[in-house]
């Protein structure tokens, strides 16, 4: 009886919006659902493929500009990012006000790092959004699951907005077969002019491995292999791995001869240009040396649950679609609490029903 009452209360308070904050699904690469506009000086600029998250605490965003094309210093404090539906009504789904911190220069490019000064989210009605924020604060009070990252309320809200843009969950390969590692990453973004930005937790071994190697290979995961991202997450804390024990076959990348998964949809080989310790993370700016597309298919991605709720609300059969998409997310995360399986024979590829990820 008590559980039934709780279910009714949840249904009234949250409707169909009580989803995991990190929601996984498959989408074409590159994503075509969201456009990010930089506003506050002249005509808005499309920076969808020119920005990257830098750090969680303090939450920091990097935006890339062509050399000499950055906004004037007098306008920097008035800039904002608007996250908009790319098609349809082109609805504004969220906005982050920006506060400039520092500038980094590389050949032909300038990168400005910002922290949030404000954050607005329009994916859910205001009342329902406030209910979610209260629930989030209560859960944080009861059980701190932030893994040592302390974020302000503004930073948490801005982080939710950033992940309205679908983020690919990629596998990072570093080193050689004799002394190397492979682990997942989803804090990354293109910065323009062949540059890429990505971030790794500063206290974990993976960040040091990448900095010392100076070059890595980034592999796009097909949706059917998404669970591997969770199975390999513990490799962030390892100096090296035994590649022969991975549950999948590998091949060598074309430019740097780094082991990468045979099933990769796309492999980008990048060379580190600069590294900066910023709060909880190490931020890397890298130059793309080679970009190989091997096959088409849905790429394994993550979005925020608020945005998934907005996506589902547009569908006629919302309740059924909710169940289906939740089943797909749970299927993708089934490796989260499992140790990495030891390879005892040919890897079995489990094909995911395309209807399970919406």
Task: Report each predicted region and the residues it spans.
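Basic, polyanion-binding surface patches
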Residues: 2-358
């Amino acid at each position: 009886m008590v559980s039934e009452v709780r279910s009714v209360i949840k249904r009234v308070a949250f409707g169909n919006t009580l989803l995991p904050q990190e929601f996984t699904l498959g989408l074409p690469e590159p994503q075509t659902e969201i456009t990010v506009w930089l506003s506050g000086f002249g005509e808005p600029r499309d920076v969808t493929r020119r920005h990257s998250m830098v750090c969680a605490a303090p939450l920091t965003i990097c935006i890339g500009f062509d050399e000499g094309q950055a906004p004037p210093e007098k306008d920097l404090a008035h800039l904002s990012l608007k996250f908009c539906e790319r098609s349809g009504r082109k609805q504004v789904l969220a906005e982050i006000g920006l506060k400039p911190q520092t500038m980094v220069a590389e050949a032909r490019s300038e990168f400005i790092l910002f922290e949030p000064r404000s954050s607005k989210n329009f994916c859910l009605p205001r009342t329902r959004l406030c209910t979610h924020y209260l629930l989030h604060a209560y859960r944080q009070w009861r059980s701190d699951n932030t893994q040592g990252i302390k974020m302000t309320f503004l930073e948490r809200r801005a982080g939710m907005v950033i992940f309205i843009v679908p983020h690919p969950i990629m596998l990072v390969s570093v080193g050689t077969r004799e002394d190397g590692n492979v682990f997942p990453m989803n804090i990354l973004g293109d910065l323009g002019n062949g540059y890429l930005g990505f971030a790794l937790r500063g206290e974990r071994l993976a960040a040091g491995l990448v900095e010392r190697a100076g070059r890595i290979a980034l592999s796009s995961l097909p949706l059917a292999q998404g669970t591997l991202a969770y199975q390999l997450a513990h490799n962030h804390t390892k100096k090296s791995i035994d590649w022969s024990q991975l549950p999948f076959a590998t091949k060598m990348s074309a430019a740097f001869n780094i082991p990468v998964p045979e099933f990769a949809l796309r492999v980008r080989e990048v060379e580190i240009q600069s590294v900066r310790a910023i709060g909880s993370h190490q931020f890397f700016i890298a130059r793309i040396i080679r970009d190989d597309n091997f096959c088409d298919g849905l790429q394994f991605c993550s979005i925020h649950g608020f945005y998934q709720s907005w996506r589902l609300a547009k569908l006629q059969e919302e309740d059924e679609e909710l169940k289906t998409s939740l089943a797909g997310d749970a299927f993708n995360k089934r490796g989260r609490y499992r140790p990495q399986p030891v390879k005892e024979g040919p890897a079995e590829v489990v094909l995911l029903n395309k209807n399970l990820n919406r």
